[in-house]
Amino acid sequence: MSLQRFLQRQGSNGNLEYCADSAYGSYSVLTGQLTMEDNRRIQVLADTVATLPRGRKQLALARSSSLGDFSWSQRKVVTVEKQDNGTFGFEIQTYRLQNQNICSSEVCTMICKVQEDSPAHCAGLQVGDIFANVNGVSTEGFTHKQVVDLIRSSGNLLTIETLNGTMIHRRAELEAKLQTLKQTLKKKWVELRSLHLQEQRLLHGDTANSPNLENMDLDESSLFGNLLGPSPALLDRHRLSSESSCKSWLSSLTVDSEDGYRSSMSEDSIRGAFSRQTSTDDECFHSKDGDEILRNASSRRNRSISVTSSGSFSPLWESNYSSVFGTLPRKSRRGSVRKQILKFIPGLHRAVEEEESRF
């Protein structure tokens, strides 16, 4: 059946009556004062159902009952009558709800208790109902005292228009939970910041000189590179290079000297002298015996160079040679072996000895 069987009639007094075919189920006649917003919702619902396919019209009409409950059954009018010396049998409480969207508060008066077998209980009042109108007077924005005065001034007959406060009560609970969670989050955030600062102090020391430490991404290598100094591998490399340079320098002195220094200074003694060093700053010249030997050898070598007639040595080489910490160039072993061989050649032995004995 088409939706044209669905009749809508509105009287001059604003009353609305619904009639539907039996295929859609029977609807009770609802009579009440409707607003323009309610009429607009009904018209939108009718237009929506009319455009749906036939198979979905039944489902849409079934869902329309929930919209009807929201617009009408949430609001009900209750009349409570009491005896002269009796009570209505209910208690009210006023709540102030904070509206987060518009930064304002809403005041609502709610029934918090209903006595059994009381006039209010028999009239149908329930816990959680919110006062919207009392004796034709809207209670929107009323304080608790104003609502109490309005109820007491009504006499024995009280007409109350109420709203279902389940959603509002649920909203109040959610707002309270939200505020609690915000407070907890704020405390946890403070604890997190404190732990972060403690971690920064443990890792990087005093943070007084760096107030913006939490905003900086510090690299571990840049933090510890200047504090730890060179790596052990670098120290070993420097120590080996220094020791090898000293060994090469002393070996050149040992090969070239002919005054008994060669017999008293061997490679093992050199290794032992350099193994007793305890610091890398002075490198390999800390041994007292090594200092004396190197000083004597240097003086003897300088004397031999000064009296030698050969001009193969440059002044730059002499200045570097006289420096204790300089790496001295040495003669090749091939030249030294040649001198040893020339000693055994007849006619040349005397000349070599005379040349070597000048210093």
Swiss-Prot record:
SMART domains: PDZ. The keyword Metal-binding does not apply. Residues 166-188 are annotated as: Interaction with CYTH1. GO terms for cellular component: cell cortex; cytoplasm; cytosol; early endosome; nucleoplasm. By its binding to cytohesin-1 (CYTH1), it modifies activation of ARFs by CYTH1 and its precise function may be to sequester CYTH1 in the cytoplasm. Interacts with CYTH1 and SNX27. This is Cytohesin-interacting protein. The gene is Cytip.
